[in-house]
C-alpha cells in the first residue's frame, strides 16, 4: 500500500524516516535475459544457466546489478504517491551505489525507502532517498543506493 501525500511539501515532515516497504517482486530469468539484450551485457553469469550452474559461485544465473538498480523507479511508484502539486518527477542521479549480494534468477526483491533529505532547488524539491533493496531469504541487501529525485512543482 503506497504512502499517499496530497502535496510534495508534505515530504518535509518525513525526513529521516522510513517511508515504506514495497511488496516482493520476482526477478525472472526471462527479465534478466531481456535486460542483457537491451544493454548488450551478455556476460555468461547472466545468460548461460548451464555454465553458471557449473562455474559460478552462485550456482545459477544472476541479475545485473544495474537491472536491480533500474527497478527503483518501478518500486517508487508502488511506494509513494503524490496526488497534486507535481508537474513531473525526474531521476536526478545517484550519490552512492553498492551491490552487496547477488540476485539469483527467479528470486524476489523488495525495497525499503527512507527519506534522507529534502531541499528546495529552483522550481523543484530535491529528495535524497536511501533505497535498500532486500533479497527474499537473505539478511544482506542486494543493492544499497542514495537516490536523488527532483519533484518539479
Per-range role (PLM):
Residues 1-14, 99-153:
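HotDog/MaoC-like acyl-thioester-processing domains
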Residues 2-63:
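Catalytic strand-loop segment that frames the active site of acyl-thioester-processing enzymes
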Residues 17, 21-23, 31, 41-43, ...:
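A generic structural signal for short beta-strands and their flanking turns/coil linkers
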Residues 20, 24-26, 98, 148-150:
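Generic structural detector for well-ordered beta-strands
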Residues 21, 70, 111-113:
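A generic structural signal for residues embedded in beta-strands
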Residues 59-60, 73-112:
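Hydrophobic beta-strand-centered segment that forms part of the acyl-chain substrate-binding groove
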Amino acid at each position: 500500500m503506497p504512502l499517499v501525500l496530497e502535496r510534495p511539501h508534505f515530504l518535509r515532515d518525513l525526513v529521516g524516516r522510513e517511508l515504506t516497504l514495497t511488496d516482493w517482486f520476482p526477478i525472472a530469468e526471462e527479465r534478466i535475459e531481456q535486460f542483457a539484450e537491451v544493454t548488450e551485457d551478455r556476460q555468461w553469469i547472466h545468460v548461460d544457466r548451464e555454465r553458471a550452474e557449473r562455474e559460478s559461485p552462485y550456482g545459477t544465473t544472476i541479475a545485473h546489478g544495474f537491472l536491480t538498480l533500474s527497478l527503483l523507479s518501478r518500486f517508487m511508484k508502488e511506494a509513494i504517491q503524490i496526488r497534486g502539486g507535481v508537474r513531473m518527477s525526474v531521476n536526478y542521479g545517484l550519490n552512492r551505489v553498492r551491490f552487496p549480494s547477488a540476485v539469483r534468477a527467479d528470486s524476489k526483491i523488495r525495497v525499503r525507502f527512507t527519506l534522507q533529505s529534502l531541499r528546495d532547488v529552483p522550481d523543484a524539491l530535491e529528495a535524497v532517498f536511501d533505497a535498500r533493496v532486500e533479497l527474499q531469504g537473505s539478511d544482506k541487501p542486494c543493492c544499497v543506493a542514495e537516490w536523488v529525485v527532483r519533484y518539479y512543482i
